[in-house]
UniProtKB/Swiss-Prot annotation:
Signal peptide segment: none
Gene3D superfamilies in the cross-refs: 3.10.450.50
Pfam families: SEC-C, YchJ_M-like
Protein name: UPF0225 protein ETA_15740
NCBIfam families: PRK01617.1, PRK01752.1
Family assignment from sequence similarity: Belongs to the UPF0225 family.
Domain of life, source organism: Bacteria
Length: 153
């Protein structure tokens, strides 16, 4: 199968996020983990999502609501805006923009995700939502002002 990876890397799924979602390897960077989590959302892979959350998040507590959302949500694209690994090498950030539809309504997620590495394995811990001014360039990458693009939704 030579299918491109849903994460938008332009690599084949079998050499990009596929090994992570099949359980054969762990992502070695925060960006690789974020991309694999995007794939897990797109493929409705609840076990992978739960396993990739930091244990302190107690992700099992909201597994049922997450699984319920799968039937109404479709993921349409991912754009990585920036990545950063702090000098301690165990904390990383990935800012991204993802398009999705929920109950057939187009929407997007613009997040700065935080990742922690413990025992050589990266975990998602939480995320914040960077503010976007109406006259800023839209984080979707269109080149338009936010108010003329995704800010209209």
């Amino acid at each position: 199968m030579s299918e491109n990876c849903p994460c938008g890397s332009e690599l084949q799924y079998s050499v990009c996020c596929g090994p992570y979602l099949r359980g054969g390897a762990y992502p070695d960077t925060p960006e690789a983990l974020m991309r694999s989590r995007y794939c897990a959302y797109a493929q409705q892979n609840l076990p992978y999502l739960i396993a990739s959350w930091h244990p302190s998040c107690n992700a099992q507590n909201f597994a049922a609501s997450l699984e319920e959302s799968f039937s109404n949500t479709r993921w349409h694209g991912l754009r990585v805006i920036s990545t950063e690994v702090l000098s301690d090498q165990d904390t990383g950030y990935v800012t991204f923009f993802a398009r999705f539809s929920e109950n057939k309504q187009q929407s997007f997620l613009h997040e700065r995700s935080r990742f922690l590495r413990e025992e050589q394995r990266w975990y998602y811990i939480d995320g914040t939502f960077p503010p976007t001014g109406r006259n800023d360039r839209c984080p979707c990458g269109s080149g338009k002002k936010y108010k003329k693009c995704c800010g209209q939704h």
